[in-house]
Amino acid sequence: MPSFRTLTLTLCLATLAVSTRAMSQGGTPPEVLLRLDDVGMNHSVNTAIERVARTGMPFSVSVMFAYPWYQEAVEMLKKHPNVNVGVHLVLNSEWRNYRWGPVLGKTAVPSLVDSVGYFLPSTREFLDSKYDLGEVERELDAQMQRATTSGLKITYVDFHMGTAGATPQLRAVVERIAEKYRVGISRSYGEVSNTIFSAPVDQKTSELIKGLARAERGRTNLWVIHVAERTPEMDVLFDRNNAAQNSGTGVPLVAQHRQGELDAMLSRELAEMVKANRIKLVTYEQLNARGGPRVRPPVP
């Protein structure tokens, strides 16, 4: 005959199992923020963003206002109020044979550019250069002015390739700009950061789904995504900073990777995962509405 202690332990375990199951089924749903980067890079990225926007799902996009195709992105985004807009602050130009420079022009910020007036290719090269912090602030402010006068509502900023936040001094510049324009800074809301950037092309969707299945409750789970339609203009893009984006023989794979991430965003599996797990998709505009824009990470 079972002892009283055994019966008590069994009852406690059964109660715990029921409580855990109830929490998983009826507790606070996981919160996920989808941030799609590099908007305005080219036509193929812009058309991919529009395809995702047409699904109606809420998500955030980071527009690069120093990029050649930002104006097309602006006009497209005005048609899709479900899309929240931020600024991808740019201090680098990473592609081979496809370059850009500062909004202010090379003569206004000479310490930020190479000999022909383009941004430097990598974060390391930028940090090793003799950049002037005052020029950094003026250029990033010019990018923000272009963004805020575009007709789009801007709610946050982030850093292309991490460069604008790579040192405490650079971060302080961005914080001043964010406060000036009353916007938040991505990853300053206590987000759990995730990406499928380095996932194999044929595993982008499955890696995203597996990651969402592990989403932390009580936290904002940030997923940084890079989408594009695979087109001739994308097929020739060679990433000079990330070997995983090119084959071992030097063939560019960027187009395949970004098409894979677009496929993941448009997949039936993603839609079913969001519905089945009651995932709450949020944007930075919603995070700001909770307590104002955040420009500094929360203290642990």
Pin down the residues of each PLM region:
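Bacterial N-terminal signal peptides that target proteins for export
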Residues: 1-9
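Conserved, mostly hydrophobic/aromatic
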Residues: 38, 85, 157, 223, ...
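Acidic (Asp/Glu)-rich catalytic clusters
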Residues: 49-55, 72-84, 101-114, 148-149, ...
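Catalytic domains of cell-wall/extracellular-matrix polysaccharide-remodeling enzymes
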Residues: 130-210, 214-216
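Active-site beta->alpha N-cap acidic-glycine motif
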Residues: 27-96
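Bacterial N-terminal signal peptides
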Residues: 8-19
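Active-site gating loops and adjacent loop-to-helix segments of metal-dependent hydrolytic enzymes
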Residues: 100-127, 238-253
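C-terminal domain-boundary segment and adjacent tail
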Residues: 185-188, 244-300
